C-alpha cells in the first residue's frame, strides 16, 4: 500500500473531497486509511464507569485508499511510484519526481 501513517494526503472523492489532512492509521489488509477529521461518524457508547450517562462520540471512519492522493513536500498531489536508491526501495512522486521517504 502506497500510503503510510503520517503522510499528508488530499481526499479526491466523497463528501470530504478536497480536504488535506494527515493519515492517522493505515489498514493494509482492507486497503483503507483513517485520515484526521475526514469521514466523521457518530458512535453511541453504552454507559460505563467512566461515563454513567453514555455518550455519542464523533470519530473518524476508515476510507478507501483509492480516495486519497499523497502530497509531496511542496503540497502537490500526484501518483506514487517506487524506485531503488542506494540499494533501498523508496517512494517518489511521479508528478514531481521528489523522493518521499
UniProtKB/Swiss-Prot annotation:
One of two assembly initiator proteins, it binds directly to the 5'-end of the 23S rRNA, where it nucleates assembly of the 50S subunit. One of the proteins that surrounds the polypeptide exit tunnel on the outside of the subunit. This is Large ribosomal subunit protein uL24. HAMAP family: Ribosomal_uL24_B (MF_01326_B). GO terms for biological process: translation. Part of the 50S ribosomal subunit. SUPFAM superfamilies: Translation proteins SH3-like domain (SSF50104). The keyword Oxidoreductase does not apply. It comes from Streptococcus pyogenes serotype M1. Belongs to the universal ribosomal protein uL24 family.
Amino acid at each position: 500500500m502506497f500510503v503510510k501513517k503520517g503522510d499528508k494526503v488530499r481526499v479526491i472523492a466523497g463528501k470530504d473531497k478536497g480536504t488535506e489532512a494527515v493519515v492517522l492509521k493505515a489498514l493494509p489488509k482492507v486497503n483503507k486509511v483513517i485520515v484526521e477529521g475526514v469521514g466523521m461518524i457518530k458512535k453511541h457508547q453504552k454507559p460505563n464507569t467512566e461515563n454513567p450517562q453514555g455518550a455519542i462520540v464523533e470519530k473518524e471512519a476508515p476510507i478507501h485508499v483509492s480516495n486519497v492522493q499523497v502530497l509531496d513536500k511542496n503540497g502537490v498531489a500526484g501518483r506514487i511510484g517506487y524506485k531503488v536508491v542506494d540499494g533501498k526501495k523508496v517512494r517518489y512522486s511521479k508528478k514531481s519526481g521528489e523522493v518521499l521517504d
